[in-house]
């Protein structure tokens, strides 16, 4: 079963969107196997966004992601990376398809409410950055036979 990392960013947390976003994910049949509200420090932010070091927007990105709490999650399901990315929508909310999380809740590319791993490799790396193995749970959902 595939796993991915998804994070409600500070703008989503501060606007009270955690519940709505998690509800959308669970209604799709995706299993939430870990979740926690955390404050990211600069060191963790730099590790998470290491591929952007040196880019013009890097400092703004670090400043934003450390500006308030985030809700970090591990999701599990068949093709969960692709499904979660589709549910999030394009990075620019103005280009995101109607019904996606970013189209519904985000207003700016730099404040786009949610982050999700873009590949199995990044999912593994991000999950290991934000979660200890004992924090990721395995359980059966009653709806598993239906989705």
Curated annotation (Swiss-Prot):
Subcellular location: Cytoplasm
Record flagged with keyword rRNA-binding: no
Gene3D superfamilies for the chain: Nucleoside diphosphate kinase-like domain
Biological process (GO), any one: UTP biosynthetic process
Cofactors required: Mg(2+)
Chief place of localization: cytoplasm
Binding site for ATP: 9, 57, 85, 91, 102, 112
Annotated GO CC locations: cytoplasm
Enzyme nomenclature, EC number: 2.7.4.6
Keywords: ATP-binding, Cytoplasm, Kinase, Magnesium, Metal-binding, Nucleotide metabolism, Nucleotide-binding, Phosphoprotein, Transferase
GO-annotated molecular function: ATP binding; metal ion binding; nucleoside diphosphate kinase activity
Catalytic activity: a 2'-deoxyribonucleoside 5'-diphosphate + ATP = a 2'-deoxyribonucleoside 5'-triphosphate + ADP; a ribonucleoside 5'-diphosphate + ATP = a ribonucleoside 5'-triphosphate + ADP
UniProt keyword annotation of Nucleus present: no
Residues annotated as the enzyme's active site: 115 (pros-phosphohistidine intermediate)
Oligomeric and partner information: Homotetramer.
UniProt cross-references to HAMAP family, sorted A to Z: NDP_kinase
Function: Major role in the synthesis of nucleoside triphosphates other than ATP. The ATP gamma phosphate is transferred to the NDP beta phosphate via a ping-pong mechanism, using a phosphorylated active-site intermediate.
NCBIfam families membership: PRK00668.1 (NF001908)
Family, as annotated: Belongs to the NDK family.
Protein name stated in the entry: Nucleoside diphosphate kinase
Organism per entry: Listeria welshimeri serovar 6b (strain ATCC 35897 / DSM 20650 / CCUG 15529 / CIP 8149 / NCTC 11857 / SLCC 5334 / V8)
Lineage: Bacteria, Bacillati, Bacillota, Bacilli, Bacillales
Gene from which the chain derives: ndk
């Amino acid at each position: 079963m595939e796993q991915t990392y998804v994070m409600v960013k500070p703008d989503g947390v501060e606007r009270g969107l955690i519940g709505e976003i998690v509800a959308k994910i669970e209604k799709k049949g995706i299993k939430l196997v870990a979740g926690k509200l955390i404050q990211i420090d600069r060191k963790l932010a730099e590790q998470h966004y290491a591929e952007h070091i040196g880019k013009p927007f890097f400092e703004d990105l670090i400043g934003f992601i450390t500006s308030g709490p985030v809700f970090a999650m591990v999701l599990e399901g068949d093709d969960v990376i692709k499904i979660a990315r589709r549910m999030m929508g394009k990075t620019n909310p103005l280009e995101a398809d109607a019904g996606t999380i970013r189209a519904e809740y985000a207003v700016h590319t730099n404040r786009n409410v949610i982050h999700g791993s873009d590949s199995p490799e990044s999912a593994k790396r991000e999950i290991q950055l934000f979660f200890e193995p004992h924090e990721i749970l395995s359980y059966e959902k009653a709806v598993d036979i239906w989705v």
